């Protein structure tokens, strides 16, 4: 499946992201909840989220527990109406030097664990930035969370060497996962 992401990348405002997501038809999209709501009235976005969820699988990108709180609130208020909530936890994106550490997963898990059953995600995924990418992914995998690895987030192997290609990162991760 092709997954389209609507992250702002420091370039696109929420109106541009909403316009893109409204016009395309793809099986799977990811939406950074904090970015899509920037300068938007959340209640006014209910029809947008309804249309998006009707035509695509939607993965909500969460950079911290505050994003998780916001998403949970939108679901609770029926602004986002879904029976199958999917989230992507992003570790290290807004940390010093975009470096992630496995303990950055803790606030996400703590918030998730206090949610009522109907607000818990059906599918969780993680990506992590910097040299800590693989240690973070290993921690997440041990919690039953799907992992996303690649050069977009980090180029370092667990031994500190720079990977020659994405396949080297994937192999390093797979080799370290329990059988």
Roles of regions detected by a PLM:
Residues 10-14, 90-97, 156-157:
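Flexible glycine/acidic-rich beta-alpha junction loops that bind and position SAM and/or redox cofactors
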Residues 28-151, 162-168:
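Catalytic alpha/beta core domains of metabolic enzymes, predominantly
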Residues 1-41:
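Active-site beta->alpha loop and helix N-cap motifs at the rims of alpha/beta catalytic domains
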Residues 1-4, 151, 178-179:
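Alpha/beta catalytic barrel-like cores
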Residues 157-179:
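C-terminal helical cap(s) of enzyme catalytic domains, especially alpha/beta-barrels
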Residues 21-22, 49-53, 173, 177:
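Alpha-helix C-terminal capping segments
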């Amino acid at each position: 499946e092709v997954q389209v992401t609507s992250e702002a990348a420091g370039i696109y405002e929420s109106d541009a992201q909403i316009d893109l997501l409204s016009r395309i038809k793809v099986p799977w999209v990811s939406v950074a909840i904090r970015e899509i709501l920037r300068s938007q009235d959340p209640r006014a976005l209910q029809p947008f989220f309804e249309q998006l969820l009707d035509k695509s699988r939607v993965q909500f990108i969460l950079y911290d527990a505050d994003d998780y709180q916001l998403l949970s609130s939108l679901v609770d208020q029926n602004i986002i109406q879904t029976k199958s909530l999917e989230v992507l936890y992003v570790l290290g994106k807004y940390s010093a030097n975009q470096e992630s550490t496995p303990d950055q997963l803790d606030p996400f898990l703590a918030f998730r664990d206090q949610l009522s059953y109907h607000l818990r995600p059906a599918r969780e995924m993680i990506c992590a930035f910097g040299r800590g990418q693989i240690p973070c992914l290993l921690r997440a995998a041990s919690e039953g969370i799907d992992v996303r690895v690649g050069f977009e987030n980090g180029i370092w192997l667990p031994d500190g060497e720079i990977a020659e290609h994405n396949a080297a990162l994937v192999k390093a991760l797979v080799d370290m996962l329990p059988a």
